[in-house]
Amino acid sequence: FISMSFNQIFRKRMLEYPPEKTINCHAGKLPFYRGRNILNWALINDESEFGITVHYMDEGIDTGDIIHQKLYPIFDEDDYFSLLERAYSGCAELLYQAVKLLQSGTAKRTPQQLIHPEGFYCSDRKEGDEILDWNQSSREVFNFVRAICLPGPQARTFLNKNEILSNHVECI
């Protein structure tokens, strides 16, 4: 079985059906970016790169042994949409490579605990998270807006009780 961007947790029975053959493509650098909304958080956190990871699925959330991982640079010109496009094509490429490794019997398993004993989970974005905080630095506002631009909810602020949506900002 292959999973990609699936927002449900598979039951143990489902994971055991094809033993050690259920894999997931995760648009995050595991074990550091587990969970959801990874690309948003990578931008908000001003990361210089994001990862795509193909891993075995287990009962945890994005905790299985890593089969294949590739890192991609994040540029100031990037936003959520551009990272999403790169993640989709990157996941397709890495899944293909991982399946070939599995078929040939040469797939390696890297336990995530060897990289970092605990990992890190990204929280869900909630309603209200899209409101701009003007007390942040200009770099933080820049990262925030590009992290939640379309197809995300867009950054919101208010001026004289009028709502303003922001989809793009530049640091000058």
In which residue ranges do the predicted regions lie?
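Donor/substrate-binding cores of folate-linked one-carbon enzymes
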Residues: 2-120
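Internal anion-binding site segments
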Residues: 116-172
